[in-house]
Amino acid sequence: MSNAGLHVAVTGAGGLIGSALRRRLEAAGHRVTPLVRRPASAGEISWDPEKGRLEPGQLEGIDAVIHLAGENVGARWTSARKRNIKNSRIQGTRLLSEAIARARRRPGVLVSASAIGIYGDRGDEALTENSPPGDAALDFLAEVGREWEAAAEPARASGVRVIHPRFGLVLSPKGGALKKMLLPFRLGLGGRLGSGTQWMSWISIDDVVGAILDVLLTESFSGPVNLVAPEPVRNRDFTAILGGVLSRPTPFPVPAAVLRLILGEMATSTLLASTRVLPKRLLAAGYRFEHPDLETALQHVLQASS
């Protein structure tokens, strides 16, 4: 795929990752067309995943589609919220994939988001793209991940190159988990979660964007790719490093029972789950991380926000 002048359609272009990616794409000379769930303004495409509304002709002239939209998982999971988390990912991916497959002039590549939650809670096991997904019968995020990636099959079957970036914990002060952590940590109220032994697989927002661009422009790249830094850490170490970067103590651990009482299944599947994921394919492809270790990553993203 040519490195210059691509026309890229992006869902979730106003989100944490999408907005940073859009800036980088446009700075590199590419044209970005957001897909929006409202009447489209100039330079936008309107679609509605819930109603199945997206005409294949709307993707004519598009070189690549990057699909990032999906319901946030970061709140207590009611039955309705779990349904929204699942449907927002699977319906949107299937609709895009089917529209791409039916288009007369198809985009050459679909980058369709996934997440490391697909692996489930795996203790100390080192996980690569070759590792099997977690048990869908036992883990909601593993179930969602399997179906989310499978929903892109129509595009894959039509010959389109499909990439699934499996996102880890994205570090940015502008949103996501880190933004929620900053206030208590800055007040000196931070602490490990549960035992603190669970692994956290993280990545800086800069490396998220850089890695997506790399795999997008590499013709030989398809399938799943772990978007995580090469040095995952345990929660207790993440806590200590973040406290150190902020020059604050971290004396207040939060018991697992309290987290489960407040957040239910979400706490078990996200905050307390251990997912030690490695970026095997990115490293094999020669991607050079801007922020391979947690301390320098946190220093950079927090300095950039100040």
Where are these regions (language model features)?
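Mid/C-terminal beta-alpha module of Rossmann-like enzyme folds, strongest
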Residues: V215-E265, Q299-S306
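C-terminal amphipathic/interface module of NAD(P)-dependent oxidoreductases
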Residues: S2, L6, S269-S306
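Conserved beta-loop-beta element that borders a ligand/cofactor-binding pocket
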Residues: S114, A150-P173
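Glycine/proline-rich active-site loop of Rossmann-fold NAD(P)-dependent oxidoreductases
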Residues: R146, S158-V160, L171-K180, V215-V225
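NAD(P)H-binding glycine-rich loop region in Rossmannoid oxidoreductase-like domains
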Residues: S41-G92
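N-terminal Rossmann NAD(P)H-binding glycine-rich loop of SDR-like oxidoreductase domains
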Residues: L6-A28
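Conserved Rossmann-fold NAD(P)-dependent oxidoreductase catalytic core, especially the SDR/UDP-sugar
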Residues: R94-L138
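Alpha-helical substrate-binding/gating segment
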Residues: L182-G190, Q198-P232
